[in-house]
């Protein structure tokens, strides 16, 4: 049970990133009602796709990575494609977290410490927990997660009493904005790259992994809804639009909330929350990347690497990009939605489709049957095509 609790918090901690706080800017022109529907729908979609991995792990060893699952049903080609997409995506995310974490750490260090030293220190300090092992990540994540929740509770306690029901009844200024916001909220429910690590940590316990995914994602959904409720209830739609014109950043949102609540505590609590959210996301993503590399070496090259070697392979490439070629990971992140959709929706749907033919009587099957698999696949593909429609001018732009 202790590992199950830790795994649940790792699911939530990986999903709840610093970007959560700026999500109301994405939904600024939509209104709370449609934002709520969108969040519930995408949570259901991505929780369903995550549970497909639980079904799959009944047919594989508990330490099998996503690449191994792909090879089991689609051969070497499946492994190559699945591993390449996942590693590129996770490397890009880690580079972004390292860069952001270094900037946060720089504010706490003497001026003589430059940007590169701050980035290096952040990587060494928090990367060490990942190198030590999942148990170590579990322990530090629990502490950070509960402090993060405390900071979030402080913010909510100051904002919720000030909300106005009329603000929550605002309707979209343009219904097309609902479609445009979908990809941003879609990726906000991403933790699927960490599922192999969690399954290994839980020794292949299907019930425990299912519980961790359902409860961890539900915690995230509740946090997203409460934050949207607080901001949309506090600010009118006109005030949101003014923020988008003057300062479409988290800082602009914090200033607007201060103007209404008059509390300086909000800014401090928001900064603490965003810092801890970045770290917990880094831990979850980093753990998933390290074990993806371990799976690749072990099963494709018959190499059993030590944790330090795996740590170097995990963190040196994104560290180099963050220090010397930031344009590289920014370019990769430009296709983050497409890569995420592939390994979080397209891949598990395809694998389960084949697994159900090969193993007709699995003890646990995700609800819905093959028709639901097709619907989920189509929705995933449609959502990832939306950014292209925005760039082409067919849909309105949103922040995010």
UniProtKB/Swiss-Prot annotation:
It catalyses: L-tyrosine(in) + H(+)(in) = L-tyrosine(out) + H(+)(out). The keyword Transmembrane applies. It is found in: Cell inner membrane. PROSITE patterns: AROMATIC_AA_PERMEASE_1. PANTHER family: LOW AFFINITY TRYPTOPHAN PERMEASE-RELATED (PTHR46997), TYROSINE-SPECIFIC TRANSPORT SYSTEM (PTHR46997:SF2). InterPro entries: Amino_acid_transport_2, Trp/try_permease_CS, Trp_tyr_transpt. Transports tyrosine across the cytoplasmic membrane. The transport system is energized by the proton motive force. One of its GO terms (biological process) is amino acid transmembrane transport. Signal peptide: none annotated. Its main location: membrane. GO terms for cellular component: plasma membrane. Belongs to the amino acid/polyamine transporter 2 family. Mtr/TnaB/TyrP permease subfamily. GO terms for molecular function: aromatic amino acid transmembrane transporter activity; symporter activity; transmembrane transporter activity. The keyword Transmembrane applies. The chain crosses the membrane at residues 5-25, 34-54, 80-100, 117-137, 143-163, 176-196, 211-231, 250-270, 273-293, 313-333, 335-355, 370-390. Keywords: Amino-acid transport, Cell inner membrane, Cell membrane, Membrane, Symport, Transmembrane, Transmembrane helix, Transport. It is a multi-pass membrane protein. Gene3D superfamilies: Amino acid/polyamine transporter I. This is Tyrosine-specific transport system 1. It comes from Haemophilus influenzae (strain ATCC 51907 / DSM 11121 / KW20 / Rd).
């Amino acid at each position: 049970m202790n590992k199950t609790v830790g795994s649940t918090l790792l699911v939530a901690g990986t999903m709840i990133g610093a970007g959560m706080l700026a999500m109301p800017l994405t939904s600024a022109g939509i209104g709370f009602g449609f934002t709520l529907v969108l969040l519930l729908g995408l949570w259901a979609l991505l929780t369903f796709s995550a549970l497909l991995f639980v079904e799959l792990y009944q047919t594989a060893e508990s330490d099998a990575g996503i690449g191994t699952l792909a090879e089991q049903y689609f051969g070497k080609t499946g492994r190559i494609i699945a591993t390449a997409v996942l590693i590129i995506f996770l490397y890009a995310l880690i580079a972004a977290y390292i860069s952001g974490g270094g900037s946060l750490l720089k504010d706490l260090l003497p001026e003589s410490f430059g940007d590169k030293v701050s980035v290096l220190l952040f990587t060494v300090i928090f990367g060490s927990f990942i190198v030590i092992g999942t148990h170590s990540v579990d322990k530090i994540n629990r502490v950070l997660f509960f402090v993060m929740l405390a900071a979030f509770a402080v913010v909510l306690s100051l904002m919720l009493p000030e909300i106005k029901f009329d603000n929550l009844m605002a309707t979209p200024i343009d219904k097309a904005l609902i479609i445009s916001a979908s990809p941003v909220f879609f990726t906000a429910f991403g933790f699927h790259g960490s599922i192999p690590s969690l399954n290994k940590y839980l020794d292949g316990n299907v019930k425990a992994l299912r519980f961790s995914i359902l409860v961890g994602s539900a915690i995230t959904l509740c946090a997203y809804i409460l934050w949207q409720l607080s901001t949309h209830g506090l600010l009118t739609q006109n005030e949101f639009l003014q923020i988008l014109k003057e300062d479409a950043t988290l800082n602009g949102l914090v200033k607007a909330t201060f103007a209404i609540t008059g509390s300086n505590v909000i800014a401090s609590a928001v900064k603490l929350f965003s810092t801890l959210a970045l770290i917990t996301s880094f831990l979850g993503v980093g753990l998933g990347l390290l074990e993806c590399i371990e799976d690749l070496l072990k099963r494709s090259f018959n190499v059993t690497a030590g944790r330090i070697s795996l740590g170097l392979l995990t963190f040196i490439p994104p560290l180099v990009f963050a220090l010397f070629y930031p344009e590289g990971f920014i370019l990769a992140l430009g296709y983050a939605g497409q890569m995420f959709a592939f390994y979080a929706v397209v891949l598990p749907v395809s694998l389960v489709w084949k697994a159900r033919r090969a193993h007709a009587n699995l003890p646990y099957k995700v609800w819905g049957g093959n028709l639901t698999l097709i619907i989920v696949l189509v929705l995933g593909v449609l959502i990832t095509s939306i950014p292209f429609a925005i760039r082409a001018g067919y849909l309105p732009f949103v922040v995010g």
